[in-house]
């Protein structure tokens, strides 16, 4: 239950960071990608990523016991780096202006869930999570 709320809180935090970053980016560069990335998409993607992370974290703890947290952290970090290929290789609609700037907006957002997860860890974990025997 605590892990679920950790994932939910991290998802909300990373969604808020994504929305703020998107608004700043669009204001600074005077571009918009509202047809592709909008608030429901950002909230949904961040919540799904962090809730999936919570499930993965719980699974790693159950299967790997004491090493579960460090293994999960490695998997989550590597997964964030690997997911960067998605916005880089995205095929945008032809009517999108400045398609070359789309990855500059979306690549940093791929790291927001993992950053939020690690940032709020002290609120949800006193020590390492060690499942009961």
Predicted region positions:
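Juxtamembrane/transmembrane-helix boundary motifs in multi-pass membrane proteins
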Residues: 2, 33-41, 67, 97-101
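Membrane-water interface at the C-terminal end of transmembrane alpha helices
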Residues: 2-6, 10-18, 107-133
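Aromatic-anchored segments of alpha-helical transmembrane domains
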Residues: 15, 77-88
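Membrane-helix boundary elements
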Residues: 16-42
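Membrane-water interface at transmembrane helix exits
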Residues: 17-26, 57, 61, 65, ...
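Generic alpha-helical transmembrane segments
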Residues: 40-54
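Loop-to-transmembrane helix junctions at the membrane interface
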Residues: 53-81
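Membrane-helix boundary connector in multi-pass membrane proteins
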Residues: 85-105
């Amino acid at each position: 239950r605590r892990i679920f709320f950790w994932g939910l809180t991290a998802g909300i935090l990373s969604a808020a960071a994504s929305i703020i970053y998107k608004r700043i980016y669009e204001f600074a560069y005077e571009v918009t990608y509202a047809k592709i990335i909008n608030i429901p998409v950002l909230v949904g993607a961040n919540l799904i990523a962090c809730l999936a992370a919570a499930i993965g974290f719980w699974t790693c703890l159950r299967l790997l016991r004491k090493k579960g947290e460090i293994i999960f952290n490695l998997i989550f970090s590597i997964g964030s780096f690997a997911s960067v290929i998605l916005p880089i290789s995205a095929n945008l609609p032809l009517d999108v202006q400045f398609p070359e700037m789309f990855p500059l907006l979306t690549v940093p957002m791929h790291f927001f869930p993992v950053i939020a997860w690690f940032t709020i860890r002290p609120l949800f974990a006193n020590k390492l999570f060690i499942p009961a025997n």
